[in-house]
Every structure is written in structure tokens, then in C-alpha cells.
């Protein structure tokens, strides 16, 4: 049998690394959609996924089918029955096993051309040398302090970063691409390539956004996320949703923010109720929500890697009750 890796090369228009004839055949439909240059960029990209929950399984599915070079999974969580409701890669026989290693077989069946690695690595031990290996890092973690730590590493090493999580019928993602360049073709003859630059903020900076600059359409989950982040940055843990002292501290954080940003006539209770709602539903994943948010995040990852169109900057909020999605920049 001919080794696909040894087949002749189909060079990209930019003269860089191209696709083998075998790859060009496998990814024919994708190439027709976004072009051979974009597919070649995907085939050179390496994506690190931290936290392999139901939402992340949807994101991974979309990225693997798109045809990246390799993915790395980091999550030593032991599977329980509660993990089965929205996860694409595990079943009842998976209970009691490590979620990252248990997901490998199902992922490999989606696209055998993608290399899959599993790392038993704690966020605390991740360093510049480790992060530099990747084109992009995607994380789903309940501890927002962990999210901020990984984001800082990515930002320092100019690695694209996405955080995404779902909370029952709600979901969101945040992206930090530092200084992101993308290229478009003009409609003139002959067509010219135009370069565009988008500037992104870090997760920490966005969480410190001035609440007084928000408006009535600003999604309540943003305020809740900011409140939870302030707690977790201080304690390096997620608040206990049945702890009176933790809930009391969350209330104090909200009141302090209202005072800090001079938000007169503001009902602090609506922010507190939203914060409690996100906290209570942090471990609840619903399949349709994961599929919708995961599809959007997957599409963003493809746009980021291929650099051929504008990307969302920097928050996306999905509300499954209203059936609406909203992009905001904080």
C-alpha cells in the first residue's frame, strides 16, 4: 500500500508547505470551501485542548474534521455517569476511566490523518517551552484563575487562545489573539491582497472592564463571570454554591464593583442571582447548547488558523432560552 505521506506534493499558491495528493483528495470539499492555502495552514497547525468536557468534544470534532495536523488532550478527570449526557466520545463503558485517553479512539475515527497526543500535565506546570509547541490553545475550565494563567502564557508566546464553557442553557467563549492579522482579496482586477489587524485584550484585562461603560443589552453572564473571576483570583478555587460565606463574599464583590464604577440606582440583586445561576449550572451540560456553541467556536478556530477573514473579538454569549447569540468586546 502506498504511504500517503510519500505521495507527490501539491504546492500552495504562496509557495509554502503544501498538501500531498492524498490529502488534497481527502480534503477536496474543504479546499473548495476555503481554498488550498487555507487547508495547507490547517494541516500545519497544532491545537492544545485543556478540559475535555461535552462542549469541548463538539469543538474537537469540528477542528479534527477540518484537518489540522495534530491535537493534544490534557484532562485527567475520571469519567462518571454525569459526564455522559453531552459528550461525543465516551459511553457507559467509559465510566471510571480517564477522559482524555478514553476519547482518543473516537476522535481518531473522525479523521485518521490527525495525530492525537495525550499529556498528563497540570496547568501549574505548563511553561513557555510547552505552550510554544502549539498554534492555538483552547481551554474549558471552571476555575477562571486557571483560564487567566493559561491565557497569560499564550499571550506571552503569541499563541492564539480561546476559553469556552457552557452553563446549562447558556454558553460563551472568549478569544485573545493578541495582535491578529488576516488577509482578504479585493474585487478589483487584478485582485489585490489587503492586510487587516485586530487588537485583542487579555482575559484578566477583560474581567476588569469598567461596568459603567456597559449598557442595557450587555449580557448578564458577563457581570457574573467578572464576579466569579475576582473571587477565584483571590482564592484560586471555584466558590462553593452552598457556602454562606462564599455567597456572602460574592455579594460583597458585586457591591464593591457597583460602588467602584459609580453605578447609581443599580439593582445588585440581579447581578447576584445571575452569578448564582452560573455557579449552580457550571457542571450542567446540555447537548444542543454544546453543539451550537461548539460549532461557532470550531468555525472561529478555522478562521483564526487560516487568517482569511475577520474573526469575533472578543466575547460571544449564547442564550438557549431566548435562542440568541451576542458578540461583545470588553
Curated annotation (Swiss-Prot):
<dbReference type="InterPro" id="IPR035985">
    <property type="entry name" value="Ubiquitin-activating_enz"/>
</dbReference>
<dbReference type="GO" id="GO:0019948">
    <property type="term" value="F:SUMO activating enzyme activity"/>
</dbReference>
<keyword id="KW-0833">Ubl conjugation pathway</keyword>
<dbReference type="GO" id="GO:0016925">
    <property type="term" value="P:protein sumoylation"/>
</dbReference>
<dbReference type="GO" id="GO:0005737">
    <property type="term" value="C:cytoplasm"/>
</dbReference>
<dbReference type="InterPro" id="IPR045886">
    <property type="entry name" value="ThiF/MoeB/HesA"/>
</dbReference>
<dbReference type="Pfam" id="PF00899">
    <property type="entry name" value="ThiF"/>
</dbReference>
<keyword id="KW-0539">Nucleus</keyword>
<dbReference type="InterPro" id="IPR000594">
    <property type="entry name" value="ThiF_NAD_FAD-bd"/>
</dbReference>
<dbReference type="InterPro" id="IPR000011">
    <property type="entry name" value="UBQ/SUMO-activ_enz_E1-like"/>
</dbReference>
<comment type="pathway">
    <text>Protein modification; protein sumoylation.</text>
</comment>
<comment type="similarity">
    <text>Belongs to the ubiquitin-activating E1 family.</text>
</comment>
<protein>
    <recommendedName>
        <fullName>SUMO-activating enzyme subunit 1</fullName>
    </recommendedName>
</protein>
<comment type="subunit">
    <text>Heterodimer of sae1 and sae2. The complex binds sumo via sae2.</text>
</comment>
<comment type="function">
    <text>The dimeric enzyme acts as an E1 ligase for sumo. It mediates ATP-dependent activation of sumo and formation of a thioester with a conserved cysteine residue on sae2.</text>
</comment>
<dbReference type="GO" id="GO:0031510">
    <property type="term" value="C:SUMO activating enzyme complex"/>
</dbReference>
